[in-house]
């Protein structure tokens, strides 16, 4: 029997959420975290195509894109599902997928052999099977395309063709429109983040944790490929992936720098605008079949973030702007660190687009909640440097 949605969160995290949001809200948030986003967003790459033209292209592929009411470059698709209830018990042989593969199947992806942990020994190619995560949650039903032995031993190939996932999001990366760089799959709050930065072409702009490039390429698009954005990431592989995205999207005004962003002041640049999408506990990411992080992860990560924040503040000119964002729900990584910034000579500013909720005991910052905004859990703050410390 699979655990219910509350059991998917460590007890101390459940208590933490209850204290932070109140019991009723906390339960609603945790329930939604277990599901994929209801509205799956993509950003129209207006460097290459208009929103209306892309809608036409996608409709030709049998898709049903809808216009975002908030952003002229936003389109979204409505999630399908749930296709079966939590207590549905099909009488079928079982394939167990690892957490990552199970989360993908749960949203409509196929199951490939590397994602198979174990399987019933009587499974033959062509059999109908059920797919469960390692903790017993039913994520989908499909047809075995390998027998038991092959799917548990092979390092590549399709193990199960998924015919009935729990939920279904559109599969977009195979589309011609994707290859041509007409769009980038990106959540609504992430798009709002780049808009809140309000980039101008004569600004010195730094994106401090840039790869794989969603927000950087959005800023480039808002600048119509003018000016320059310095994009920093310490991972060579992630920067390689970012380079592919930049090329696909036709972005021309980004300079990639491989370095630890905590050492940003060593470059001696005084920026007008800095975007810091900080490394975080990712407590707001959906779907989460189960959560493993606890309070000690929250506390350690909030401390770790301060090294990036301090580097950003030192690298801003006086009067410069920092937009700070996370995909997490904790107070310490969000409002707690905004208080740290204020102590270090920063002042909170109004955001040009505000479609989330106010912060916890703090106005001008915006929070996105899974149960209220049908998005990931997300946080955005905009601050201006008013004094040097």
Swiss-Prot record:
Give the catalytic activity. cytidine(72) in tRNA + S-adenosyl-L-methionine = 5-methylcytidine(72) in tRNA + S-adenosyl-L-homocysteine + H(+); cytidine(72) in tRNA(Thr) + S-adenosyl-L-methionine = 5-methylcytidine(72) in tRNA(Thr) + S-adenosyl-L-homocysteine + H(+); cytidine(72) in tRNA(Cys) + S-adenosyl-L-methionine = 5-methylcytidine(72) in tRNA(Cys) + S-adenosyl-L-homocysteine + H(+)
Q: Which UniProt keywords apply?
A: Methyltransferase, RNA-binding, S-adenosyl-L-methionine, Transferase
Pfam families according to UniProt: Methyltr_RsmB-F, PUA, RsmF-B_ferredox
List positions binding S-adenosyl-L-methionine: 209-215, 233, 238, 260, 277, 304
**Biological process GO terms, please?**
RNA methylation; tRNA modification
Residues annotated as domain PUA:
92-167
Which superkingdom is the protein from? Archaea
Enzyme class, one word? transferase
GO terms (molecular function) for this protein are: tRNA (cytidine-5-)-methyltransferase activity; tRNA binding
State how activity varies with temperature.
Methyltransferase activity is much more higher at 65 degrees Celsius than at 55 and 37 degrees Celsius.
So what EC number does this one have? Answer: 2.1.1.-
Q: Which family does it belong to?
A: Belongs to the class I-like SAM-binding methyltransferase superfamily. RsmB/NOP family.
What is the documented function of this protein? S-adenosyl-L-methionine-dependent methyltransferase that specifically methylates the C5 position of cytosine 72 in several tRNAs. This modification appears to slightly promote the thermal stability of P.horikoshii tRNAs, but does not affect their amino acid accepting activity. Four elements in the acceptor stems of tRNAs are essential for substrate recognition by this enzyme: the target site C72, the 3'-CCA terminus, U73 or G73, and the second base pair C2:G71.
Name listed for the protein in its UniProt record: tRNA (cytosine(72)-C(5))-methyltransferase
């Amino acid at each position: 029997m699979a655990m219910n949605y509350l059991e998917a969160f460590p007890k101390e995290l459940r208590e933490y959420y209850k204290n932070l949001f109140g019991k009723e809200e906390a339960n609603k948030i945790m329930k939604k975290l277990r599901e994929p986003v209801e509205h799956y967003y993509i950003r129209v790459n207006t460097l290459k195509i208009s929103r209306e033209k892309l809608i036409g292209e996608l409709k030709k592929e049998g898709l049903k894109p809808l216009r975002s009411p908030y952003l002229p470059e936003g389109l979204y698709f409505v999630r399908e599902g749930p296709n079966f209830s939590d207590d549905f018990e099909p009488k079928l042989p079982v394939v167990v997928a690892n957490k990552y593969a199970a989360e993908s199947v749960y949203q409509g992806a196929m199951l490939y052999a590397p994602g198979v942990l174990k399987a019933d020994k009587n499974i033959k190619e062509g059999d109908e099977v059920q797919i469960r995560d390692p903790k017993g949650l039913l994520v989908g039903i499909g047809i075995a395309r390998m027998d038991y032995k092959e799917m548990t031993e092979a390092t590549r190939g399709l193990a199960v063709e998924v015919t009935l996932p729990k939920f279904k999001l559109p599969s977009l990366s195979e589309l011609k429109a994707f290859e041509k760089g007409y769009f980038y799959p990106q959540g609504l709050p992430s798009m709002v983040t780049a808009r809140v930065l309000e980039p101008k072409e004569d600004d010195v702009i730094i994106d401090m944790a840039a790869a794989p490039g969603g927000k950087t390429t959005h800023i480039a698009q808002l600048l119509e490929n003018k000016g320059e954005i310095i994009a920093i990431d310490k991972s060579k592989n992630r920067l390689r992936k970012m380079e592919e995205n930049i090329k696909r999207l036709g972005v021309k005004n980004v300079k990639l720098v491989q370095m630890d962003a905590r050492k940003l002041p060593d470059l001696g640049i005084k920026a007008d605008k800095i975007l810091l999408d900080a490394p975080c506990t990712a407590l707001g990411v959906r779907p989460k079949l189960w959560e493993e992080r606890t309070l000690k992860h929250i506390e350690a990560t909030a401390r770790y973030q301060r090294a990036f924040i301090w580097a950003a503040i030192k690298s801003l000119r006086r009067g410069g702007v920092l937009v700070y964002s996370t995909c997490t729900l904790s107070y310490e990584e969000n409002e707690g660190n905004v208080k740290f910034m204020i102590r270090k000579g920063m002042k909170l500013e109004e955001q040009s687009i505000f479609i989330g909720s106010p912060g916890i005991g703090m106005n001008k910052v915006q929070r996105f909640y899974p149960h209220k905004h049908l998005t990931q859990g997300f946080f955005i703050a905009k601050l201006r440097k008013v004094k040097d410390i």
